[in-house]
């Protein structure tokens, strides 16, 4: 993954796994990683993606009603 990436923080592990599956079906380069130490979460994993795909990720999450805490640029 490129240096310019963002992460989606979720409330649950199941939401993170579902988001990963949906994003991969949409042909986006994503992966689940541990939540960075400087960010907090109820869930220990987050979805990493290229920052250029932020709008697409937000659309996928909204269309599929996947709840998330926040999106952070890293």
Regions found by a protein language model. Name each.
Residues 13, 17, 22, 29-49:
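Amphipathic, hydrophobic secondary-structure cores in small proteins
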Residues 7-10:
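A short beta-strand micro-motif
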Residues 1-3:
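Short, Lys/Arg-enriched, disordered terminal segments
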Residues 19-22, 26-28, 56, 60-64:
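Generic non-transmembrane alpha-helical segments
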